[in-house]
Amino acid sequence: MSTEKLHLFNFGDPKIKTLHITWFAFFLTFVVWFSHAPMMAIIKEAFDLSTPQIKALLILNVALTIPSRIVIGTLVDKYGPRLVFSTLLMIGGLIAVGFASAQTYEQLAVMRFLSGFIGAGFVIGIRMVSEWFPAKQVGIAEGIYGGWGNFGSAAAAMSLPTIALLYGGDDGWRYAIGMMGVIAFLYGIIYRRIAKDTPKGSTYFKPKKHGGLEVTSKADFYFYLAMNVPMYLALAVLTWKLSPVNLGLLNDMASNGIYLILVVLFIVQVRTIHHVNKEHLAQGVPEIQRYKFKQVAVLDIAYFVTFGSELAVVSMLPLFFLDTFEGLSAVQAGLLASGFAFMNLVARPTGGHLSDSIGRRKTLSVLIAGLAVGYFVLSQIDADWWIPLAVIATMACSFFVQAGEGAVFAIVPLVQRRMTGQIAGMAGAYGNVGAVIYLTVLSFVDYSTFFMVIGASAILVFMLVQFMDEPSGKMAEILPDGTVQLIDVE
């Protein structure tokens, strides 16, 4: 494979302009989504919250992200990223203002629950960037989008406490979070005005039907149904964590009601997927339009172990340093752990660039193997380690984790152009499923075993990646007049 150099400061190039305005949109969604995190100590004191109530807020913040990434992916494919991203930014801004204005714990909980939709913003830009960049550049472009946008969570952690301090008073945190909401809302208006879904003269391909992926064989239909099950199981696990046997935010009736709703929703989704696929599967899909669903499944599972482990480790790493090394303050432990998130700025683009340069499957295989080794090394860290060496090991592991994420989304746009939003949404949802599963494991084991479980699961994923086909040749999409357009994926 070959790549062409991206001139990132050539704002006269429409695709470079699109990349910058889109990664910044994603950046703002993450600032808003994680705006509560650095303020939790202040919020806990202001509302006199218990530790279980704080934990419940953190769970609620991610509860809707799994289904919302699927929903947002479908909306992107149907309406286009410009409209969906701008709308999400404006709604997310209003939710942030609502959270900042909350007067009771119940209001805080509702707003954090709704914030899960904001976490789906990542999916939108994947489709937008893929429309503007050719296959030989899409890896690094998606990596820049994902890496720089993902930095929004770290930016929130670094800036919002200072902004709250500048406002001063007991309500400083409210002004800081509310201000981010206003900025997101205004940028949503700007994005709608200046963004375009495709380059001039290009066609924005859409699925024939909406509500589920179009698969091209009966075997893939059942494979697709099976791949939906873990997402519902993860939501059931989140419900269990909020139930009386754990945090107690939900009573038995509410918990059982949610379990029943999840079963009903799964049945409805099965019927919807059948409706989307029954006609063209009965007629037979032309060879030129076929793709293998295993490509989607492998990418989902790869994102499970990459992004899923990142979310889980970022959540526990400060406490890991604090508990492992005596004499560290909470602030020092947080700073040492921050190196894991900072790697996003360079690691994701590097993963995408390597994928463009040396091959998709080879890159993903090497990075997941490195990830496995990295977590096995972290499992050996104890109080006898030199702290700088522990930090270096953490950052090295983080590089493979986040470069792996970049490699996954270098491939996502090359499966089926018209369904890129849905494919990205499903992969993104699996990332959150991974976080739920890994954090659930952590609640039962010690730190060393936790890291070893991630490393062992990465070995399994490495083996599964070998079954993925290297994207090659061209994919076919149907123009509105019925003619076929071939899109290069090499």
Where are these regions (language model features)?
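Helix-breaking motifs and short loop linkers at transmembrane-helix boundaries and internal kinks
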Residues: 48, 80, 101-106, 118, ...
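Extracytoplasmic gate region of multi-pass secondary transporters
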Residues: 36-40, 228-257, 294-338
